[in-house]
Each structure stands twice: as C-alpha cells, then as structure tokens.
Amino acid sequence: MIKYTLEFPIKSSVSVLFNAVSTPDGLSEWFANNVNWKGNTYTFIWDDSEEEAELLKKVNNQLIRFRWKSQDDDTFFEFKIEVDPVTNDVILLVTDFAEDKEEQENETKLWETQVHALMKRIGS
C-alpha cells in the first residue's frame, strides 16, 4: 500500500473547516450525499453505494481519522488541519492509501474534486 498526503490551502476559520470534515452534516455537504453516525461508526451514502467507516481518532479543531471497515486494518483516511505559524494560513492535509501509483493518481483527482466542493461550500 502507498500512503500519501495531499495539502490544500483553505480560506476558512479552523472551526468552520473542522465542522465540515468531522460532522455528519458537514461531510454530507461535500464528501457524500448523506452521512449517518452511530457510536464510532459513520455510514457514508452516495447515489448507488454505501460504505461504513470507523472513527479511529478525533482531536477537536485539528484532526479526524477514519478506517473503512471494508479495508485493511493498517489503512485509514484522515483530515488534519494545520495553521502556518508565520502566515496564519489554514492548511487541510488529506492522508489516504492506494494499492498502486495508478490508483493513487485516480484518488488524488477525486480528492481534488471533493476538496474543491468543500471549499466552494464553506466559501473558501
């Protein structure tokens, strides 16, 4: 598996961005058509599919990490928020895993599309 991280500058407050990447309502605005949550299980629903993810770690206004229940235990996807100490720019780091370089390229394009939708949604 290839672990990769994508970096996106986001023009938003940390709290607004964290809400968008960590809550069912926020995630359903840009990541999936609908998101349900029960305990540590998030169910992501798209037009013709549904997938469950386990919440692995959450640090308010900093990080949220999920593991797809259908995937290998060592993989996860994560949204991490950093603030540049010099410029105060807000950065969203998306970490994910791919089987090979081709899958990584395809997933990178998908993440870019998804994060663009996120930015549009929060007015970035």
Sequence positions of predicted segments:
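Short, intrinsically disordered, mixed-charge
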Residues: 19-29, 61, 112-120, 124
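Glycine-rich portal/gate segments that line the openings of hydrophobic small-molecule binding cavities
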Residues: 25-76
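Beta-strand/loop substructures that line and gate deep hydrophobic ligand-binding cavities in soluble
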Residues: 67-120, 124
